């Protein structure tokens, strides 16, 4: 019976998407939450959102052909829909809640991971809060645990400070590359920490606490910079 349930859960999980399709889906969800007056999006608006410099990693240069292929992929998967806007302009909207089986907080986290790639819980709380407010880190972690249980998010590194999370919509080849990249980063950072392993336990604890406080300040500064970037984009549009 457990095997049947596991097979059913696996078959119901969303299938991997191409990088451009993930970017398009992320933009549709993001704009629906942050600029609802301009949503649903036209093809031109979607392309602009895919290629914007703020809140994106990696940077992409999506053209009309790329976007149309990605939209075909999303519609075939049931993750996006085409509608007729005013003046017979074709527009697009996401169906992420139904396709992913999530609510607002879950959609915000998965969207942020699609738009920026792997992140820590602290980074996700700061960045995803522009789409859904997370009052504290515990509330973010509770939602992360739920997404992990649903097979939508996974942890790429062991639990602890700096634990990194990623969505589960990568293609198998992309995921292998990503895991290998994370392993190399961990290996390069392990050497200095081993050299410092002779530090006394109280000193190490104090140092970790100082680093955590610095990270909190960096998260706060990052959030303010992102708000300024968003404001500049609005003024320039």
From Swiss-Prot:
Region described as Disordered: 187-211
Polar residues compositional bias, start-end: 187-202
Pfam families for the chain: DUF480
Similarity comment: family membership: Belongs to the UPF0502 family.
Protein name stated in the entry: UPF0502 protein RB6530
Annotated organism of origin: Rhodopirellula baltica (strain DSM 10527 / NCIMB 13988 / SH1)
């Amino acid at each position: 019976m457990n095997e049947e349930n596991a097979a059913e859960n696996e078959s119901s999980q969303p299938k991997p998407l191409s990088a451009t399709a993930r970017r398009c889906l992320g933009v549709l969800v993001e704009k629906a939450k942050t600029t609802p007056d301009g949503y649903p999006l036209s093809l031109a608006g979607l392309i602009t959102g895919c290629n914007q410099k703020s809140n994106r990693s990696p940077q992409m240069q999506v053209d009309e052909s790329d976007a149309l292929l990605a939209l075909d992929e999303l519609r075939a998967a049931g993750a996006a829909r085409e509608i007729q806007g005013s003046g017979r302009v074709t527009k697009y909207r996401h169906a992420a809640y139904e396709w992913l089986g999530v609510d607002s907080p879950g959609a915000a986290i998965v969207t942020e991971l699609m738009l920026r790639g792997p992140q820590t819980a602290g980074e996700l709380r700061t960045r995803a809060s522009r789409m859904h407010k997370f009052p504290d880190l515990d509330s973010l972690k509770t939602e992360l645990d739920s997404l992990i249980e649903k097979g939508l998010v996974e942890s790429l590194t062991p639990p602890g400070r700096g634990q990194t999370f990623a969505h589960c919509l990568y293609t198998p080849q992309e995921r292998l590359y990503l895991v290998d990249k994370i392993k190399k980063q961990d290996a390069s950072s392990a050497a200095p920490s081993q050299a410092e392993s002779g530090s006394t336990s109280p000193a190490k604890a104090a140092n970790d606490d100082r680093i955590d406080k610095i990270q909190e300040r960096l998260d706060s500064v990052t959030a303010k910079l992102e708000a300024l970037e968003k404001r500049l984009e609005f003024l320039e549009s």
